[in-house]
From Swiss-Prot:
Pfam (any one): Ribosomal_S11
Function: Located on the platform of the 30S subunit, it bridges several disparate RNA helices of the 16S rRNA. Forms part of the Shine-Dalgarno cleft in the 70S ribosome.
GO cellular component: ribonucleoprotein complex; ribosome
Organism expressing this protein natively: Lactococcus lactis subsp. cremoris (strain MG1363)
UniProt keyword terms in alphabetical order: Ribonucleoprotein, Ribosomal protein, RNA-binding, rRNA-binding
Protein name as annotated: Small ribosomal subunit protein uS11
Gene3D superfamilies noted in UniProt: Ribosomal protein S11
Domain of life: Bacteria
Summary of subunit composition and partner proteins: Part of the 30S ribosomal subunit. Interacts with proteins S7 and S18. Binds to IF-3.
């Protein structure tokens, strides 16, 4: 049977980019793009093997952020601006992990969508 050859990822020398952190109550997704919005690298707590309620922890968000940062640094990324979306628990730790991984964070902006009284919110949890 013929061996399938996969294209090697071409190393792009991109100096600056944008880190999009989507932090929900269930998971944290980190996506790194260039300034035009083309994806360079991504990672999430679920993709790293965390399952169930462990995906929503700050530690899982930290690991996802480190993995995405490492993949983006292989393509030459050095400085990033961060956009954070969502109410999850992994917001702060994901940003700290980016700085600890060696990326220079220039700005942090919160782009959480706020409804102008749109859909009815889910009922309160009684635990």
């Amino acid at each position: 049977m013929a061996k399938i050859t996969r294209k090697r990822r071409v190393k792009k020398n991109i100096e600056s980019g944008i880190v999009h952190i989507q932090s929900t109550f269930n998971n944290t997704i980190v996506m790194i793009t260039d300034v035009h919005g083309n994806a360079l690298a991504w990672s999430s707590a679920g993709a790293l093997g965390f399952k169930g309620s462990k995906k929503s922890t700050p530690f899982a968000a930290q690991m996802a952020s480190e993995a995405a940062a490492k993949a983006a640094q292989e393509q030459g990324l050095k400085t990033v601006s961060v956009t954070v979306k969502g109410p999850g628990s992994g917001r702060e730790s994901a940003i700290r992990a980016l700085a600890a991984a060696g990326l220079n964070v220039t700005s942090i902006s919160d782009v959480t969508p706020v409804p102008h009284n749109g859909a009815r919110p889910p009922k309160r949890r009684r635990v």
